């Protein structure tokens, strides 16, 4: 692809389009519950909370046997222990976060079969007794309210299971059996407190939304929100080459179309996307490079005006055990941070998105490139312009030269850019230059953290007239550029 024309972006300062809803910072994902007992996991989550503003966290396996939640005594009666759950929630509250509790997987004491998923062997079978399943959920809800109080727990979310539409992967039962599982969990939660929030179906590919709504309506089953997941492709454990081919077949911007459809199907219930990423593979090289940053920013810009409850990125860390814990610093993991806590380009994308405080302002385009997306916001001190240059893999994309015109500004003090691209905020590039060491020492970790940082680059601007300035930008393929214009 070759574009000879210079693209022009005109920002109309003062023409406000409304406040930004930071739904992407409402929640973030992680692996399974026991990793939340690790000190390094906790340190990384606190960093994300402090720097990216995430409010909730969601992960699998609150009820797994490795959490020691549910046992059957010698007399056949059930026994419960919420000690590990308390440890996790205590920590979350301590750092100013809250849990988005996914009710999974099935404790062995309740399970009807032995089918499991992942390296940590979460049981995916329906319960032998739905009454006992309801008993477990009720006991959990009662304990949480007893420990943390109604007002606190009412701010949390209870989501029933994970991707039950992926037959024999996450759920060994039928859709009807999932609805029964949901019904018993929802009634158990509402029995404890009618104001606790419960929802589902937590499906892959935006599935089962009208079906669950219809089931709940016809059967008088409580439901407070719809949750679902989306990825441009659903080849979760394919080879990297197959994954690239599948990603290349995805339609650019298709996630936004699917979000709109989900909102229509769920109405009037709110929609919470509790997983999304550029692919569902935990070994996808694109997760580690600037491509992912451009994809993230482009996707958020596409859906910025939609009334989402949350859009929870999967995941914040590469401390992740679904396929076993990889020791490679850059192994294509989902995380915003790698196993050592080194920020990837995706992390820096969220850091740039966190700058979008204030109100959106109008942008006009001339000779717009089909791979460019951008958003501008203003507040009392500055204007922020964020640009993504993104296309799906193996598709045309080029460096874009852009002239920016800012109209209506009375006092410009400074303009600077921060970049995420092949040469900036790209620690994997430096790791490859090191020779791709499998195990990093302290000095290498520090060097890679430094390589990951956003760097401020001053931009020269020209004054067109008293209320108008202009400057030029170059935006590399699969990159993000954030421009800050200081005016106060």
From Swiss-Prot:
Enzyme kind, highest EC tier: hydrolase
For this UniProt entry, the molecular function terms from Gene Ontology, in alphabetical order, are: xylan 1,4-beta-xylosidase activity
UniProt keyword list = Carbohydrate metabolism, Glycosidase, Hydrolase, Polysaccharide degradation, Xylan degradation
SUPFAM superfamilies referenced in this protein's UniProt entry, alphabetically: (Trans)glycosidases (SSF51445), Glycosyl hydrolase domain (SSF51011)
Q: Which PROSITE patterns match?
A: GLYCOSYL_HYDROL_F39
Q: Reaction(s) catalyzed by this protein?
A: Hydrolysis of (1->4)-beta-D-xylans, to remove successive D-xylose residues from the non-reducing termini
| Catalytic residues in the record | 163 (proton donor), 275 (nucleophile)
Q: Which residues form the signal peptide?
A: none
Reported EC number(s) for this entry are 3.2.1.37
Which GO annotations describe the biological process of this protein?
Answer: xylan catabolic process
Instruction: Offer one Pfam family short name for this entry.
Output: Glyco_hydro_39
Q: What does this protein do?
A: Beta-xylosidase is an intracellular xylan-degrading enzyme.
Family stated for the protein in its record: Belongs to the glycosyl hydrolase 39 family.
Supply the PANTHER family for this chain.
Answer: ALPHA-L-IDURONIDASE, BETA-XYLOSIDASE-LIKE PROTEIN-RELATED
Name assigned to this protein? Beta-xylosidase
The species this protein was found in: Caldicellulosiruptor saccharolyticus (Caldocellum saccharolyticum)
